[in-house]
């Protein structure tokens, strides 16, 4: 099995001959790649205290660090770096998580109906005030009988969808190790809030929100998600917001 894998690897290098021309053999290429990658892998994502950090991807000091994890949607933190998130908290760093957009349009209408029915029934049980109960019934009726596909979402529906995602994100952050709710930040960047799949362009209003968070927290380390293959995607826009904020500070 090992011989077959080695032969297959050699065939790849033969077809992509430039690497062999540069390094002489497949073995040399493998060693070079291994040496480059090994120093980017660590069990101490915030840096290992009281250790030589000359060959580590993150410096040992200061310890503990103030860390911000930027999550484009309210789930990208745990999807893309859940283990790292947990390890940072486990190793006693001061971890903040910033959800850059509400992610509201990803929530299905049936979810909103279910939560509104729950809200309606709770209000009917515990309060005589009809305000919230009537609003829940209004949203349920709209989604079941009046909504037209392709139109921008109503603000009340967007609020409900955003709230559902917000509480899911809060639960995920707590599970990952966040102890205090004031370390969970919902930025609700304005470029996202169109109610449609198509979003607005990044603006100074978005950048200002990120700048304020950076100024308030003063992080020693940041983790930023970004899909560089899609220049108009939400992940790329969120990355650009952080980079622009850093440039302006």
Protein language model regions, located:
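Active-site beta-strand->loop->alpha-helix modules in alpha/beta enzyme cores, enriched
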Residues: 1, 6-74, 78-248
């Amino acid at each position: 099995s090992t011989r077959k894998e080695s032969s297959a690897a050699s065939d790849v290098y033969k077809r992509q001959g430039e690497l062999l021309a540069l390094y002489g053999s497949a073995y040399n290429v493998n060693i070079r790649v291994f040496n480059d990658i090994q120093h980017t892998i660590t069990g101490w994502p915030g840096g290992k205290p009281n250790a030589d950090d000359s060959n580590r991807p993150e410096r040992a000091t200061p310890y503990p660090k103030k860390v911000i994890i930027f999550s484009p949607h309210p789930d990208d933190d745990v999807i893309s770096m859940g283990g790292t998130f947990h390890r940072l908290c486990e190793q006693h760093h001061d971890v903040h998580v910033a959800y850059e957009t509400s992610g509201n349009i990803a929530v299905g209408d049936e979810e909103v109906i279910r939560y509104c029915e729950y809200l309606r029934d709770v209000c009917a049980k515990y309060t005589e005030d009809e305000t919230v109960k009537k609003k829940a019934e209004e949203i349920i009726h709209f989604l079941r009988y009046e909504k037209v596909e392709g139109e921008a979402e109503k603000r009340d529906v967007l609020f409900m969808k955003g709230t559902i995602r917000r509480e899911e994100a809060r639960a995920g952050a707590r599970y990952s190790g966040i102890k205090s709710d004031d370390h969970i930040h919902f930025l609700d960047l304005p470029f996202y809030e169109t109610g449609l799949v198509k979003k607005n362009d990044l603006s100074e209003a978005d950048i200002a929100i990120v700048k304020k968070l950076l100024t308030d927290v003063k992080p020693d380390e940041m983790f930023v998600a970004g899909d560089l293959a899609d220049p108009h995607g939400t992940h790329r826009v969120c990355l650009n917001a952080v980079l622009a904020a850093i440039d302006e500070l």
